[in-house]
């Protein structure tokens, strides 16, 4: 962008107005790009979460079943945050249990170590199967759940698409 002006009050004022208009276009582009990337990230993370399997409950016959779960992804703070909501979000993202996720410090999720994910309770991960009591007072046996990583996988995918998304947003202005 080139702006030519003379050293006169009116010419300088016109140049300043041109710059202010350009600044508004840049701010709109930044906001539109941020929102578009955030919405695509949320949409793809939701698709991955919807196809995830959660839990591995073992029934009395030894059959393994997946549990129902809630994993809702939304955009917040004017596109500055993509948030996953639900009671099972951490388990779906990072996994639970030594059976699927290995010994302490060997989580399949690349960011787990930074968040102290992958440590185990009193038994230190010695048991591949454990039980908990459900809302009906019944013991449920489980191996835990493998790290599905919908947020992390979506981030990797969308990050590679940012140049193309930026071009699409710029062309739409």
Functional labels for PLM-detected ranges:
Residues 1-89, 112-115, 119-173:
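Short, Lys/Arg-rich flexible segments
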